């Protein structure tokens, strides 16, 4: 029998789980203080729903569940691999929420402000920062088409990050419609815009020349590629410059409103910036998109955007929707590396008792000590020094004894 967890999945030791519980609790507390309500959905979704969810590259990372019994036999006989699975593990929480809302719309308030903190699964190639099973902490607003929904999500999410001790971050914001409008005005065909956007999204990593080379490899119009290269080279990738190439000024006005309002709410505690190359990988985003980044860490710690077409796939009627997700695993990992300590947490001690000690008396003393400490009751070992060393190594702050009033705190030795 193998003792190791599967690749890309993790066992958690008590100290890390305690920190995760605290962080998730603070995030939930912040979300709930803003009137958001928590729901839960199944981990498994219908494969047809998953396949039609426009999840970008995530659609290639779905853990699929084989059909069973006669249905599997019949599927094997077709010779079509797509017939083998009828359900799969969710790769994020947006598709399940959209299905949930469509099924329960008449029972829910409008707009619906919702929390989801749950596990999702992706068949990633395991590496640092890439797990196959991980937790997402999402808030979404369904039923509000105004840019105030984006402002509220940014405000609540950033307050959650601040409340768990996260500082020095930047909220980057863009609108896919403005970027697409600019690219179309340069001569890129509408059916190539998604591909162009994905390449443009990597500009901060590969530079302007890298973007030009990658678009050339895709055999896109040379004149359009050169127009984009000239625009980037001019150093004029400002919101006003990009918006000037977009046919609908209302889109740019909404983005300016969100940027200005979010910056006011930040009050200097974090930065808010327009990021012209920000796209986000999921194909279901339809408007504004946002990411939270920290200069000292690579990659985003939170991200989201507007997905006005997703619920309509179930209802046949468009429902405005926008969400923001905190990368829980990433945030926990960063705080662990920084040696984060839970504010105001009680110290953990062990109350040691002898073999002949009256056990109800042990529990009574433990109850009294719990006014000040988190107390575990343990039988005292034959080699007390060794036992105390093991307790300290396991994260205990000290030990108490039945025949002594004081608590022995290890750091004070």
Model-predicted segments: where are they?
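Acidic, His- and aromatic-enriched active-site or binding-groove loops in soluble protein domains
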Residues: 58-74, 187-211
């Amino acid at each position: 029998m193998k003792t190791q967890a599967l690749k890309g999945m993790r066992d958690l030791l008590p100290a890390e789980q305690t920190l995760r519980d605290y962080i998730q609790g603070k995030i939930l507390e912040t979300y709930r203080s803003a009137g958001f309500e928590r729901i839960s959905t199944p981990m498994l979704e219908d494969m047809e729903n998953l396949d039609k969810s426009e999840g970008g590259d995530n659609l290639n990372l779905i853990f699929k569940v084989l059909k069973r019994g006669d249905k599997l036999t019949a599927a094997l006989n077709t010779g079509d691999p797509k017939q083998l699975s009828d359900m799969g593990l969710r790769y994020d929480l947006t598709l399940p929420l959209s299905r949930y809302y469509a099924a329960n719309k008449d029972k829910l308030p409008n707009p619906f402000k919702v929390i989801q903190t749950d596990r999702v699964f992706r068949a990633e190639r395991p590496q640092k920062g890439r797990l196959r099973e991980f937790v997402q902490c999402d808030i979404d607003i369904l039923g509000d088409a105004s840019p105030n929904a984006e402002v509220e999500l940014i405000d609540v999410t950033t307050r959650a990050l601040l409340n768990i001790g996260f500082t020095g971050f930047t909220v980057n914001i863009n609108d896919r419609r403005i970027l697409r409008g600019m690219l179309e005005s340069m001569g890129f065909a509408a059916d190539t815009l998604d591909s162009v956007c994905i390449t443009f999204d990597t500009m901060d990593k590969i530079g302007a020349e890298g973007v030009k080379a990658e678009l050339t490899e895709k055999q896109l119009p040379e004149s359009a590629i050169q127009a984009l290269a000239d625009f980037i080279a001019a150093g004029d990738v400002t919101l006003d410059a990009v918006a000037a190439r977009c046919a609908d000024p209302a889109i740019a006005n909404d983005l300016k409103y969100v940027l200005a309002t979010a910056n006011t709410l930040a009050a200097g505690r974090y930065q808010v910036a327009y990021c012209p190359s920000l796209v986000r990988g999921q194909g279901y985003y339809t408007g504004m998109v946002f990411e939270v980044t920290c200069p000292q860490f690579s990659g985003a710690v939170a991200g989201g955007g507007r997905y006005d077409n997703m619920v309509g796939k179930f209802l046949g009627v468009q429902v405005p929707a926008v969400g923001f997700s905190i990368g829980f695993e990433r945030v926990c990992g960063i705080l662990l590396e920084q040696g984060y300590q839970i504010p105001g947490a009680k110290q953990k001690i062990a109350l040691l008792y002898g073999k002949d000690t009256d056990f109800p008396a042990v529990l009574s003393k433990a109850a009294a000590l719990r006014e000040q400490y988190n107390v575990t009751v343990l039988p005292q070992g034959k080699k007390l020094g060794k036992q105390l060393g093991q307790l300290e190594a396991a994260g205990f702050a000290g030990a108490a004894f039945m025949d002594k009033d004081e608590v022995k705190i290890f750091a004070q030795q």
